[in-house]
């Protein structure tokens, strides 16, 4: 029964009528914010994708990667990706926040110091955050939130998503204390969009030299890392 529901859910997503997600066009291409050149944004979004590939391989189905950046020292502090652990909250953003929390704790920082640190850091994610992660970003009080692919793009490509934009989450968080996080959307989408285009659309090419193979689990072809396929 559960399997039938999953299959029906996927079919419904692929066959759904077009829906425009309100306030999801926040294109900040070329924008200079907080003194950071746009070229630096592109550099760190590429590093976000690279962090994903290191942790999850060249074509993970859940291609969500995140890094946390200190622009003052020009360095990546922590990274994360979506992991299947059974914990439904471990999205890339939460994974990276957890990694930084553990790192800061090991450095001897107090809880108060850790809370204060988020306001000096920028979180980069290669796809727009779901409402849960966007809320976590605002609760943390990050200095900046920078994302690539939009929720609208992923909805159009058949992903099951919550159709609430980060913009609207942020609009409802204005009363939170602390830093009002700067949001920069749709950075380097020409490189992030392809990572999310192939999962439910067999006409889309595989990223990073992966190849399509039929998936018994999903009932259609998905992209596979050819170096991970055992030789016969």
What are these regions (language model features)?
Residues 1-17:
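Fungal secretory targeting signals
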Residues 18-55, 119, 135-232:
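Zinc-dependent deaminase
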Residues 56-61:
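Short loop/turn motifs at secondary-structure junctions and domain boundaries
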Residues 63-70:
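Short beta-strand scaffold segments in enzyme catalytic cores
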Residues 70-77:
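Short, glycine-anchored, charge-dense loop/turn motifs used at functional sites
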Residues 77-84:
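Short beta->alpha transition motifs characteristic of CBS
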Residues 84-98:
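A short, polar/charged loop-to-alpha-helix boundary motif
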Residues 100-127, 217-232:
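Mobile, glycine- and charge-enriched loop segments
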């Amino acid at each position: 029964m559960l399997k039938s529901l999953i299959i029906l859910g996927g079919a419904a997503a692929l066959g759904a009528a077009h829906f425009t997600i309100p306030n999801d066009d926040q294109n900040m291409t070329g924008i200079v914010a907080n003194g950071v050149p746009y070229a630096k944004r592109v550099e760190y979004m590429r590093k976000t994708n690279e962090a994903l590939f290191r942790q999850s391989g060249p074509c993970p189905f859940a291609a969500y990667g995140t890094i946390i950046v200190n622009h003052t020292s020009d360095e990546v502090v922590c990274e994360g990706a979506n992991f299947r652990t059974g914990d439904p909250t471990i999205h890339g953003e939460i994974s990276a926040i957890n990694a930084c929390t553990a790192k800061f704790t090991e450095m001897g920082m107090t809880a108060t110091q850790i809370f204060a640190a988020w306001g000096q850091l920028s979180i980069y994610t290669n796809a727009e955050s779901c409402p849960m992660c966007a809320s976590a970003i605002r609760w943390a009080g990050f200095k900046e939130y920078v994302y690539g692919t939009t929720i609208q793009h992923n909805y159009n490509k058949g992903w099951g998503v919550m159709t609430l934009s980060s913009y609207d989450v942020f609009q409802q968080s204005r009363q939170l204390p602390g830093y009002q996080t700067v949001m920069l959307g749709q950075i380097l989408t020409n490189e992030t969009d392809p990572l999310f285009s192939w999962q439910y659309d067999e006409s889309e090419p595989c990223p990073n030299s992966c190849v399509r193979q039929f998936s018994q689990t999903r009932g259609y072809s998905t992209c596979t890392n050819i170096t991970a396929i055992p030789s016969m």
